[in-house]
Amino acid sequence: MKLAFDDFLNSMSETNTTLDYFTDFDKVKKNVAQIEIHLNQLNYLLGKDDLKQAVYDLYAECPNAFSILEILIAVRKKEQKKSLDEKGQVVTLNSYFQSADKIIDFLNNTGLADVFRDKNIKNLVDYVFGIEVGLDTNARKNRGGDNMSKAVQLLFDNADIYYKKEVRNTIFTDIESLGADVKQFDFVIKTKRKTYVIETNYYNSGGSKLNEVARAYTDVAPKINQYSQYEFVWITDGQGWKTAKNKLQEAYTHIPSVYNLYTLHGFIEQLNSEGVIKDW
């Protein structure tokens, strides 16, 4: 039995995060490995009293070593960051890496020169590993949606529910009215009664995106549900929905199968009662 909307809203979870959400160490290690040779070359500068001469010497031997200096101030090369130079001109950061004198200006003006001389850093590979961990926190927002999919997948797995993930809508040729509304579904589950096409998402905070999603799925659901052998299922969660209560309530009223992580057990019970098909 479907929960009353207020009960559904109040059962929204505070988080969908697992411990692997906070830092993607595989990505961190990959990013560090890509520049590790240059970092070890730059290690030559650490602790040098005459840093200026050390830069000249290293630049003469390995000019490309300095091409990664931006990461030492937590800036990625692809960002093409700009700053004002000593003449007040707008320049890109990588323009400082075209000569030894410019590199010395960069080190002095960013404060890295003092850090290098004072031996505050022992090894630039370890230092950049820490920077990469910090920068990776910016990707957490993107991992939120993936984490919801993982949470749903875990519940399906624990219940021994067979599913397919990220299924293109083109395999459902008999759903003529779908068009390009949903290019692929997060999960598809078949039972002896019907095929369930499932979308999942999670919102920690509010914004116009929530209203757009609720409106879109309210439109999509009847296009799919008009075919008796199919049913659209929306699994969503997060405290952000409390800022878009009205639009969610409208969707909850019009879409027969809307669940969150708390109520999903009801859908799983329904699937088991219908008999999940595994050989498709």
Curated annotation (Swiss-Prot):
MF terms in GO: DNA binding; type II site-specific deoxyribonuclease activity
First-tier enzyme category under EC: hydrolase
Record keywords: Endonuclease, Hydrolase, Nuclease, Restriction system
Origin: domain of life: Bacteria
Reaction equations catalysed: Endonucleolytic cleavage of DNA to give specific double-stranded fragments with terminal 5'-phosphates
Intrachain S-S bonds: none
A GO BP entry: DNA restriction-modification system
The EC number(s) this enzyme carries: 3.1.21.4
Family: Belongs to the DpnII type II restriction endonuclease family.
Protein name in UniProt: Type II restriction enzyme MboI
Species: Moraxella bovis
Upper taxonomic lineage: Bacteria, Pseudomonadati, Pseudomonadota, Gammaproteobacteria, Moraxellales
